[in-house]
Amino acid sequence: EDHTIDPPEDYAFWREYVPALTPPWPGKLLAFAYSHPQKPGESREGLGFDPIAENKGGRMGFWSYRRIIHTHNFVPGAYASDITIVNWPQNDYLPGSIIDVPREEKEKHLRGARQLSLSLLYWLQTEAPRAGGGTGWPGLRLRPDITGTPDGLAKYPYIRESRRILAEFTITARHVWAQARMQEMGTKYEDTTAAPFDDSAGVG
């Protein structure tokens, strides 16, 4: 089936958009390479994207990263296809904030974020490189019947906790990431623990 949407109004912008970050992003946002989450400045390209192979039990990729329905977990016919939530680096909206700005600025960025989401879908449908050659997955489609929205996009923007929480103390990767803790403690992996917090109810 071909569910290719019309090119989004801002597709030309997002197709060429390179995040202005330090350390630098590895290239265009609409690509499968992205900055390594634990090693800033390094590129990570290992996930890839192949809904068909990932459905059949191939290695994990972007499709299965936030998959909520895998047809193999249900009786045949229960679902026509897998269903995934797209919460990837490629649809992280970077040009502005919506939580500490005037209403007009907020509306501008909400519109921009929707355009980015639609542009990512259109790019995946038409231009995303396929491992076996060729480009695009035209069978991809939004699911308004699942999201409960007219267009199939999310009901609300997802704002990461670090942007919206006003904490007494912020736990960071340096407190829990094995490599950082090994360096901090001077220990081997098997002897390394997360940083202890006396007032913690649980870290996980």
Question: Where are the regions that the model predicts?
Answer:
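Flavin (FAD/FMN)-binding glycine-rich loop and adjacent Rossmann-like elements that form
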Residues: 1-204
